[in-house]
């Protein structure tokens, strides 16, 4: 969900080309609905270099491969690594000679939350955010909601009080 939201946000902020890498067919198609200009099944199929790469997967293998896609003065933003994961190998010379900037993002401040709310108020109707919640359950059906989420792997499930 973060990757799709970031895709939509980047497009509203004037990004000229947003490329999304997603192994899942359905989620790749959703990326187009959220403004992606290009989609790819895997990192290896991407041609060229990028000014910025944002990782929402948290996959160590994806991070190692994606960092090589950065152009000189590129920025790599790690968002999806919020749990312990395997260590990655970085080439310090590549980072230094190419003036690569690494940024880690975790949590948010109140002004970040306000900016997100403003984005949804101003641009939310341009993108199918409601479709990200695939099914809704009442709180008394919480076990069914968890089973559904584990079995179907939806982007989001809603549980109502």
Region roles according to the model:
Residues 53-54, 77:
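N-terminal Rossmann-like NAD(P) cofactor-binding module of classical short-chain dehydrogenase/reductase
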Residues 45-53:
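A short acidic, Gly/Pro-enriched loop at the edge of an enzyme's catalytic core
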Residues 60-122, 161:
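Glycine-rich phosphate-binding loop and adjacent beta-alpha segment
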Residues 58, 71-72, 150, 154:
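Short conserved AdoMet
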Residues 1-43:
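Mid-domain Rossmann-like dinucleotide-binding core that forms the NAD(H)/NADP(H) cofactor-binding site
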Residues 21-23, 56, 106:
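N-terminal Rossmann-fold cofactor-binding loop
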Residues 110, 114-161:
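C-terminal hydrophobic helical "lid"/dimerization subdomain
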Residues 24-26, 42-46, 80-84, 107-108:
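Short, acidic/turn-prone active-site loops that include or flank metal/cofactor-
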